[in-house]
Amino acid sequence: MVNVRPAGPDSWPDVATVMGERGDPSRCFCQYFRLRGKAWSGSSPADNREGLHAQVRDGELPPGVVAYDGDAPVGWCAVGPRTSYPRVVASPNWRTDHLDGWVITCFVVPVGHRRKGVAGELVRGALDLARSYGAPSVEACAVDTTTAGRIPSADLYRGPLSVYLAAGFTEVSRTSPQWVLVRRPAG
């Protein structure tokens, strides 16, 4: 059974395990939406790793949630106030009138744990975290997997639309056939 907990100083080794040592997560460490322009283009994988480590270790708010199957970490979801993500604030994909809400920006579910409901549990955990900090709503820019052929797993880091709809999110707008802004009250 999968359980989800907010990321905190003690969970850093688990977050690092989920990110792995190869592939996009091991280079980005969920910093893409937190950095813009030269701050992003000039950052190295080591810089990004240290950025997330500092957020997990020292942040006022947990920067996300970690999913566990027993004691084994099996997933990560980045979630936080919209204002924590400068790239989200500036992006046309995230245009909204809910500026005080929270956003889910990223999922990482390692190979071997996919298609087992981990992403759905991560969304529920992200909603719980947002609610516990008084967020009025949570938004995400989901991927509609029904509008195209096979979508590579690396392109699903924002989360499939079907996972959000199953968790009670509703479609707000589309910036393309594939990118769908979804929202749900946090409560």
Report each predicted region and the residues it spans.
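Conserved N-terminal entry element of GNAT/NAT acetyltransferase domains
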Residues: M1-K38
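Active-site rim helix/loop that mediates acceptor-substrate recognition in acyltransferases
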Residues: F29-P63
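Conserved acyl-donor/pantetheine-binding loop and adjacent beta-alpha core of acyl/acetyltransferases
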Residues: D58-P62, Y68, A72-P110, R114, ...
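Conserved residues at the C-terminal ends of beta-strands
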Residues: G80, C141, T175
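Conserved acetyl-CoA-binding loop-helix of GNAT-fold acetyltransferases
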Residues: I104-V109, R115-S132
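Conserved GNAT acetyl-CoA-binding A-motif
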Residues: V123, A130-P152
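C-terminal "cap" of GNAT-fold acetyltransferases
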Residues: A154-G187
